[in-house]
Amino acid sequence: MAKNKTNKIEKKPIKITETILRDAHQSLIATRMTTEQMLPIVEKMDKVGYHSVECWGGATFDASLRFLKEDPWERLRKFRDGFKNTKLQMLFRGQNILGYRPYGDDVVEYFVQKSIANGIDIIRIFDCLNDLRNLQTAVKASNKEKGHAQVALSYTLGDAYTMDYWVDMAKRVEDMGANSICIKDMAG
């Protein structure tokens, strides 16, 4: 915790990110909710006071195209129109972007640029193996585009994952240029 000039601990507000528009239907029904099924709740969610809503990225892009026959960019723009007071966040698979294989730096940079231009404020960037090399390009591109680069460290258990490991990872992520750090516990 940070201390001010009088040596008192400064309290910072807790900021809450709601992930239901991405993670809930990704986890429960294979990302099959259409944009039109989600839009009716957007105005109410916008009034709650969330810091951000994670509504894009992960499997949503692929499912929109392949199974729902929707334009994922149009979905993002509709969310941006509906969330007037809430930041929009996406889940970004590092060098894999939103896909299932690594892409070149130029593709990562372009995708980040287009995501921010179409309404994303915060890009939550992760690599499932915590290989920080796979995060660097997306962090740098997010910062270049004036987006918020949030690095999510993938939490796991095991003898190698000591408190020193997590502290070291956080320091390296900070040095990389991340605007914030998140612990992503995918196993729950």
Q: Where are the language model's segments positioned?
A:
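Acidic, glycine/proline-rich low-complexity segments that act as flexible tails and inter-domain linkers
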Residues: 22-26, 31
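Alpha/beta enzyme core
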Residues: 11-16, 30-60, 65-87, 96-188
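Basic/polar N-terminal segments that are highly enriched at the extreme N-terminus
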Residues: 1-12
